[in-house]
Amino acid sequence: MSTAVQVDDVMRYRDSRFQTIAAKLLPTQYLVVDDDTALTTTLGSCVAACLRDPVLKIGGMNHFLLPEGQVGDGAPTRYGSYAMELLINDMLKRGAHRKRIEAKVFGGANVLKGFTSNPVGTRNAEFVRQYLQAEHIPIIAEDLCGIHPRKVWFFATTGRVVVQRLPHAHEAEVAATESAVRARLSKAPVTGGVELFE
């Protein structure tokens, strides 16, 4: 089974809905797989990018909290720019070809109260679209913005994605989880680097 190249371990469990092993990604995590593992996450204002090389049938998902940060900010994996580089580079290391990579992107809901003039969900959605366009990675499917949290399942070998929009009752729970992660990461020390592949 494929493993995450990150300090945090990705939780795996048996998903009864799809009768397969699932890997649940939390904010700041990513995972690349080349098997039938379902990559899953729950999103509020965060965004998940699902990338895939359809020839190799390899793919991965990330889950980021904010588009970009300042130099010296803690926990760089919370930022989309860093999370996207990690995901793309891991796929390239495993043999994916940049010109074949395609994307499906999800999340960016405006569920956090008090962020009305420039909501973080909208900024995350704009970031992922602009980033992928700059990298010449086509977005072949998206479900971004709006007001509902989402649960996403991504099957890398087939490219199938299932999105379940969660009822408003889950908004407070998802928003509280994202806010708690943001607070914890703002105090985290800066570590690691990114190796870029062309």
From Swiss-Prot:
EC number annotated for this UniProt entry: 3.5.1.44
Record keywords: Chemotaxis, Hydrolase
Catalytic reaction list: L-glutaminyl-[protein] + H2O = L-glutamyl-[protein] + NH4(+)
Domain of life: Bacteria
Keyword Hydrolase: yes
Key word Hydrolase present: yes
GO molecular function, one term: protein-glutamine glutaminase activity
Similarity-based family: Belongs to the CheD family.
Protein task: Probably deamidates glutamine residues to glutamate on methyl-accepting chemotaxis receptors (MCPs), playing an important role in chemotaxis.
Protein name (Swiss-Prot/TrEMBL): Probable chemoreceptor glutamine deamidase CheD
Organism the protein comes from: Xanthomonas axonopodis pv. citri (strain 306)
High-level lineage: Bacteria, Pseudomonadati, Pseudomonadota, Gammaproteobacteria, Lysobacterales
Gene: cheD
